[in-house]
Amino acid sequence: MTSYSFTEKKRIRKDFGKQRSILEVPFLLAIQVDSYREFLQEDVEPNKRKDLGLHAALKSVFPISSYSGNAALEYVGYKLGQPVFDERECRQRGMSYGAPLRVTVRLVIYDRESSTKAIKYVKEQEVYLGEIPLMTGNGTFIVNGTERVIVSQLHRSPGVFFDHDRGKTHSSGKLLYSARIIPYRGSWLDFEFDPKDALFTRIDRRRKLPVSILLRALGYSNEEMLAEFFEINTFHINPDEGVQLELVPERLRGETLNFDLADGDKVIVEAGKRITARHVKQLEAAGVAALAVPDDYLVGRILSHDVVDGSTGELLANANDEINEDQLAAFRKAGVDAVGTLWVNDLDRGPYLSNTLRIDPTKTQLEALVEIYRMMRPGEPPTKEAAQNLFHNLFFTFERYDLSTVGRMKFNRRVGRKDVLGESVLYDKKYFAERNDEESKRLVAEHADTSDILEVIKVLTEIRNGRGVVDDIDHLGNRRVRSVGEMAENVFRVGLVRVERAVKERLSMAESEGLTPQELINAKPVAAAIKEFFGSSQLSQFMDQNNPLSEVTHKRRVFALGPGGLTRERAGFEVRDVHPTHYGRVCTIETPEGPNIGLINSLAVFARTNQYGFLETPYRKVLDGKVSDDVEYLSAIEENEYVIAQANALTDAKNMLTEQFVPCRFQGESLLKPPSEVHFMDVSPMQTVSVAAALVPFLEHDDANRALMGANMQRQAVPTLRSQKPLVGTGIERAVARDSGVTVNALRGGVIEQIDAARIVVKVNEAEIGGGTDAGVDIYNLIKYTRSNQNTCINQRPLVNVGDVIARGDVLADGPSTDIGELALGQNMLIAFMPWNGYNFEDSILLSERVVEEDRYTTIHIEELTCVARDTKLGPEEISADIPNVSEQALNRLDESGVVYIGAEVRAGDIMVGKVTPKGESQLTPEEKLLRAIFGEKASDVKDSSLRVPPGMDGTVIDVQVFTRDGIEKDKRARQIEENEIKRVKKDFDDQFRILEAAIYARLRSQIVGKVANGGANLKKGDTVTDAYLDGLKKSDWFQLRMKDEDAADAIERAQKQIQAHEKEFEARFADKRGKITQGDDLAPGVLKMVKVFLAVKRRIQPGDKMAGRHGNKGVVSNVVPVEDMPYMATGESVDIVLNPLGVPSRMNIGQILEVHLGWAAKGLGRKIQRMLEAQAAVSELRKFLNDIYNHDNAINAQRVDLSQFSDEELLNLGKNLIDGVPMATPVFDGASEAEIKRMLELADLPQSGQTQLYDGRTGEAFDRKTTVGYMHYLKLNHLVDDKMHARSTGPYSLVTQQPLGGKAQFGGQRFGEMEVWALEAYGAAYTLQEMLTVKSDDVQGRNQMYKNIVDGEHEMVAGMPESFNVLVKEIRSLAINMELEE
């Protein structure tokens, strides 16, 4: 039995899950938080830091040596400072939340004269390397005041990949195989076959070269190449006639000989017959070692080596020549005893490299190097050194080429090596053996005779020969996840490399000019690279903050797009499709609809990344059919070897698999296996899906397409005024709310001491109090009415009362869309499935007026409006209430500084901040200037540029912030805001100090009461300290007490030290805060003052708003009907929402029907509990009823609730919280069965069919048949008609065409397009059409004249020349065709 926490005891979900949970839902933001923690390694001592993140980047670039080698800059360590502003201040001020990075570097100068590089002097110094953004506790970054998320990227893993072109390149449809070595950074190396079976290579996708050029550049000769790739047949040449072949029978298979193959007299294969495997076996049995063959058998074979005349040294034939009869004769003449030929055939030993050598124009290593140089740098004259350096820098230097540990691991596994470790550059035995620098010697010593490039070519030729298979690039073993930390490290390294170049230049001057490390290093490139990445990278995204779920999902996104990834246009169907390896790693359901489908994925609930960045998923071990609770994480590569059973495989009480054949997965296929052959078993049924999909109850009954929409639309739900937990959930709601960070969770257990709307104070348990100055008080400040990124309202409200005993992790306050610590995205509505007068045609939704009345779907949106006063060429703009040509009434909401009051209710067009801008159309004469100066007539030379409420918006001002540039005097409003803020901070600190002080005194009291004192105020030696005595003593005099007991004396001293320390700390913190509040603000260049006004807009639900359930059942509100007209039940209760039943069968999302049934039962049970409580039934009766609800199922794994843990008071409290409905959980793929739903309906005294008789609210008549009625959790989505409705009378025009702009943001018009013109033409409405095309659009004079006419009361129009016609004339003239209009 589980024990329940303080929060969980308030309301318990009835869980229908049959599978015992082996693993708790892991921390959902781990992928972000852990990755960045490893990048910073902030809490790790410098000497213990792992080779990761910042540390690795710094180590890889340093030491930097000067060109002469006389000076070097070495890296010692780094540390991060304290952030200047905390998270809240950064959001408010529009700053980035980060900490300064200080790197300790050592400048070493060597003595030039000394031969042994003696050190002349060393200087160590801390250098500032820019700000490093810090991650908030919730996995976000604050960049320029907005919260952003760096999403993870799924990219192709470094390593080597083999593929073919699927027969698309050549018209014959022949498969052309290719290999590609992809490093983490550096040049790509490709190998490919052409249709004629020659092998080519490309570097960085440039033009192709025969592969032998690359091998020759590595130092291989023709003979060595052939020896590496071919087995050799040896022929002994008889002096007069015939040839003896050294026989390897296997090599004859598939050949047809033109002579009898005999062993002595016994003919094994007749001439002209093909040699089969049976013949080969006979030859092996007979032990034939040599075979006499005629000369023509040797002619046409390919030589494996150069043939030289032993006596004269004359070259008779080259390696790779085809032997002809003349050469054979020459061999005989020169007395050549034996020649070697390549063993090739058409079956499985292709002569590919031999073919390639024939088209290779180069003969020496140098020629090959020059050829590569010409291909890489066309047009540059090659020199020997340049060619060698270029080639070496391509693949063999650590600076330019890095396979990375992942790449090396993948490479070695693919070419069949046992060892997964190795160098991060490509290694070749021949190439490095010929070089004689230290690095090459080390490599040769460690890796003797391996050759990366040769092995890749060997594997490729084997695949071409029909042995081996190509790779599947969509397999998750070939794609890895790059998370925040790794991307930040790469960007940081790029910045450092830029610095490195500059430092190298300066290092040569360091010695002569006595420069310090600080003067050598310029931090700007590093800071710029980091800023650019966090501010504008494709993977740094504006956080989706609609509701807690959208935050969590955004942080768990996996993007295939972005730098180094795919592009939308080039991504084909295969990349986007669901792959068998996605199982348990990437959600198979949640992905956006539209052009990004399949490219943006979500991590599965239990997925995590391993040290190489591959996604892995947990499985339970199975041994001999017994399922254990040991969990092992497997990546897609490892999983390939195992047979894995489903999570719902049947087991008995001893955890043995009971079925004769268990449904399993093996290598991406589904099959049945006996229990003894099963290796692993899924951990949980929801293993395959992401968090959003796991929140859809009865997901297993929904069609996948609709489930996708359901998962996606939950992220768009707007937090309502009062959250309501879903009656039918899946049991994962609590985990999502906990990890999203919107709730306030207790850091330590204790007792609630003080509470108000904005703050909770907890007195911590003795056991959890740390040493030192820890006074055992935790203070939680709640977030009140703050704007989210999506303009929804973030507000936290307390859940606890004074005196409540809480434990660590308990929920103290709810945030947006949470209800007692559970995710609550919408409202539970009473729903009927029936048509109603066409108002639910095409998925429309009919609402009851009661829904609007009770504010069930009322949401608060907070809009931020900004007014900026700049310094212009004509003088500064000014924020003031003195605005020309504006009525008094328009200014009555502004104070004397010209800023709107808090609490003012404003509508579209109202002035929020008065601002005037100097206008300088008239040049003043000196006389006028003098008069102006004397009389100060100012109104005429400024224009009104005030901040007004945008069209279509109204609301209440809830906050105003004024930012003033440093050095400019603050106005009255700014000073007032500043004073209020200082007062608030002071009160906050005073309260905190008072609470801490009280806690310290209370602890001290418990330690000294009843102890004997040696003296003190009004105390004699030997007196006992009592409570009454302490009550009468001034607090400060407590420290005068001298105790006999050592411990008590220590306690007094400790308490005094604690109070003094806290007092000092609070004073310092207050001074710091005060300084921050009073200092000027860091504004953009040219900005003098900035005013931000926050408007709270209340939006009720109305026709045109989009709503949805959790099963992809979306629709638009068509009408809001009075309560009395809605269909009602026999009890008189009318329904809230009427949905169209036709929306269900074709969409196949039956989950919504089951949810409605179970929701009705949940509500019915709640009503039954309410009746019990109202009748004041005995607690035992309530306990029995709750036991019936929670523990009715006697299956082995049924989830049970131990009600004996609850005291009577707790049970009554639980009962009260269940009045609104008993919440149920039906986990995905493991949900409630039909029988269980029926049982719940029966318990609630409701019809088991889930249907009831409804009556028409307007006539009172019963409908013809019974209707499905019940409760569904229904959401209001962030597609509100208020944001989309828009109308224009007059507004801005396009500069060139003079036509009205388009779109709501530009206050544009509606386009009267080509088809609409046809419609008017068809009706013959010529005058209407003329009006549309001229005065209502782009006839500039006509429209101005028309305005005048309307003002004058004359209703007539004269259509003139449309401006677009003039544009057309100008465009034709630009083609040198003159066109003129004649009167």
UniProtKB/Swiss-Prot annotation:
- Which SUPFAM superfamilies does the protein's record reference? beta and beta-prime subunits of DNA dependent RNA-polymerase (SSF64484)
Q: Mind listing the GO biological process terms from this record?
A: DNA-templated transcription
Q: Which reaction does it catalyse?
A: RNA(n) + a ribonucleoside 5'-triphosphate = RNA(n+1) + diphosphate
Q: Which domain of life is it from?
A: Bacteria
Keywords, alphabetical: DNA-directed RNA polymerase, Nucleotidyltransferase, Transcription, Transferase
Say if the entry is tagged with keyword rRNA processing: no
User: What InterPro entries is this protein classified in?
Assistant: DNA-dir_RNA_pol_bsu_ext_1_sf, DNA-dir_RNA_pol_bsu_external_1, DNA-dir_RNA_pol_su2, DNA-dir_RNAP_su2_dom, DNA-dir_RNAP_su2_hyb_sf, RNA_pol_bsu_bac, RNA_pol_bsu_CS, RNA_pol_bsu_protrusion
Q: What Gene Ontology molecular-function terms does this entry list?
A: DNA binding; DNA-directed RNA polymerase activity; ribonucleoside binding
The cellular component terms of Gene Ontology attached to this UniProt record, alphabetical and capped at eight, are: DNA-directed RNA polymerase complex
The EC number(s) given in the record are 2.7.7.6
Subunit composition?
Answer: The RNAP catalytic core consists of 2 alpha, 1 beta, 1 beta' and 1 omega subunit. When a sigma factor is associated with the core the holoenzyme is formed, which can initiate transcription.
- What family is this? Belongs to the RNA polymerase beta chain family.
- HAMAP family attached to this UniProt entry: RNApol_bact_RpoB
Tell me the function of this protein. DNA-dependent RNA polymerase catalyzes the transcription of DNA into RNA using the four ribonucleoside triphosphates as substrates.
This chain's protein is named DNA-directed RNA polymerase subunit beta
